[in-house]
C-alpha cells in the first residue's frame, strides 16, 4: 500500500468543509456580474494624466535619435520623455527571478537607453490629458534606429557566432537548471518503448479580461506615492517602487482591488509600470497606464 493510500484513510472527504467533489460558490461573483467591480482603469483621480509608449519595432537596434517636438506640440500632450531622461530618476534594476538561482540580467531602465533589445521595448513615453491623445502623439514621435543583428532562435542563440544581446555578458545564456530525480538511465533501458521528439510551439501569454494597468499618484507635499495596481504581489511592488525611485518604503502604498485575471502575467513588475511611477514622481500628478491588446 502506498503512502497516499495510508494518508487517504485518515481524510474525511465527506466533511462539511471539504471542497472535493463540490461546486464552490464565488463570494464576489454577484458583485462582478452586476458590473460593480473595482478595476484600475475605473479609477479617475483629480489632475490625472495618461501615458502611452513608443515601442521599438526591432528585435535589436541602436537608438540613433528621438525627435519629440512634433508630438510635444499636439493637443493635450503634457510631456514627452525619453529613456535618458527617465534614467535620471530611476535606479537601474535587474530582470531576475530570485527563486531561479544564477539567472543573469544586466542593469536596465524602464525605457531603453541607447539600444533596444527586444521588439516592443519602450523607448519613449508620451503623457497627455487623455489616453487617446497620448496614443495619437506616440505616432508623431520619430525614432531613428540602426538595426543590429538579432538572436531570433532560442536554440541557436547559444552558438558562439550568434549576436550577443547584452554586451555585458559573454553569451546569451540566461540561466541553467538541472533536474535529476535519479534512476533515469535505468528507466529508459527497461522501458518497453522510448519515444523521442522535438516539440516546437509559438509565442504565448496569458490573455486576461483586464489587461495590465497601473495608476501612480505621487504626493510632493509628504513625499509619498499611492499606486493602484492589478497585480498579485503588492508587497513586492511596494519594495521595487520604493527602491527604484529612492523613496522610503513606508511612504509607498499599494492598493489592489479586483484583479481581472492573471494566468501568471501579473505576478511580475514590468518596466512600463515603473516608468508610470517615475513619471508621476517627475510631474507631481497621477499617471495612469493601461495596456491594450
List the predicted regions and their residue ranges:
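Solvent-exposed alpha-helices and their adjacent loops that cap or buttress functional pockets
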Residues: 25, 43-47, 108-110, 115-120, ...
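Flexible, low-hydrophobicity surface segments
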Residues: 1-171, 194-197, 289
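Alpha-helical support elements that line or immediately flank enzyme active sites
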Residues: 53-88, 124-145, 214-257, 262-283
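Short, Lys/Arg-enriched charge-dense amphipathic segments
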Residues: 102-115, 169-183, 273-282
Amino acid at each position: 500500500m502506498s503512502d497516499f493510500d495510508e494518508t487517504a484513510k485518515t481524510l474525511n472527504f465527506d466533511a462539511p468543509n471539504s471542497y472535493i467533489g463540490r461546486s464552490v460558490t464565488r463570494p464576489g461573483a454577484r458583485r462582478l456580474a452586476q458590473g460593480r467591480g473595482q478595476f484600475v482603469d475605473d479609477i479617475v483621480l483629480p489632475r490625472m494624466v495618461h501615458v502611452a509608449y513608443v515601442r521599438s519595432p526591432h528585435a535589436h537596434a541602436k537608438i540613433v535619435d528621438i525627435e519629440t517636438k512634433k508630438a510635444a506640440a499636439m493637443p493635450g500632450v503634457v510631456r514627452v520623455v525619453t529613456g535618458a531622461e527617465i534614467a535620471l530618476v530611476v535606479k537601474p534594476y535587474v530582470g531576475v527571478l530570485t527563486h531561479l538561482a544564477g539567472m543573469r540580467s544586466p542593469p536596465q531602465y524602464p525605457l531603453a537607453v541607447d539600444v533596444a533589445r527586444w521588439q516592443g521595448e519602450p523607448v519613449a513615453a508620451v503623457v497627455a490629458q487623455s489616453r487617446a491623445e497620448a496614443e495619437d502623439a506616440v505616432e508623431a514621435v520619430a525614432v531613428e534606429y540602426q538595426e543590429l543583428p538579432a538572436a531570433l532562435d532560442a536554440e541557436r542563440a547559444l552558438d558562439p557566432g550568434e549576436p550577443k544581446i547584452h554586451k555585458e555578458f559573454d553569451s546569451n545564456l540566461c540561466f541553467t537548471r538541472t533536474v535529476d530525480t535519479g534512476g533515469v538511465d535505468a528507466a529508459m533501458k527497461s522501458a518497453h518503448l522510448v519515444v523521442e521528439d522535438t516539440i516546437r510551439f509559438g509565442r504565448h501569454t496569458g490573455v486576461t479580461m483586464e489587461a495590465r494597468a497601473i495608476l501612480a499618484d505621487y504626493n510632493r507635499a509628504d513625499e509619498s506615492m499611492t499606486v493602484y495596481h492589478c497585480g498579485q504581489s503588492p508587497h513586492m511592488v511596494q519594495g521595487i517602487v520604493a527602491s527604484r525611485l529612492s523613496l522610503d518604503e513606508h511612504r509607498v502604498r499599494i492598493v489592489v482591488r479586483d484583479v481581472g485575471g492573471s494566468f501568471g502575467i501579473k505576478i511580475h513588475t514590468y518596466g512600463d509600470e515603473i516608468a508610470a511611477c517615475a513619471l508621476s514622481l517627475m510631474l507631481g500628478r497621477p499617471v495612469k497606464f493601461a495596456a491594450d491588446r
